[in-house]
């Protein structure tokens, strides 16, 4: 899919986003990827030959939303754990100095054939937002304590706890 005519115009951050998006699309069961996997996917895609050294730095720092900007302010990736990344989604936490920063490549900046990744990304984010409601750990606790109160009314419990207080 590589388009060498546009390789010099392609921003490193956009190349990193493309690599991460392709990994997510190829392996939808994976929640995140090792830094090395994203770098290797960018290399394999061959959007810029040879692979620019900046790709690694963007995956580690410049494009990672929840890390302090240094100097890149992009919000294209999200650090899920040490050495692990996934694409950033609206609603993810991010460093305050990255407010308003770029999340996806501009459609016109993508090499021919990669524009489909933008619509795929929107669908991926929508599906993840729906799943987040079902998987929220706090919401999962709803009703978990009802057995504790099954044989005693809450008011009676509080009254019993306060017996002997002065």
Residues covered by each model-derived region:
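Phospho-regulated, low-complexity intrinsically disordered regions of nuclear gene-regulatory
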Residues: 2-26, 49-140, 158-160
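Alpha-helix C-capping/helix-to-loop hinge sites
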Residues: 22-27, 45, 144-148
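Short linear motifs in low-complexity, proline-biased tails and propeptides
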Residues: 148-159
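Short hydrophobic/aromatic patches at helix-to-coil boundaries
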Residues: 163-166
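Generic secretory/membrane-interface signal
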Residues: 1, 37, 73, 147-149
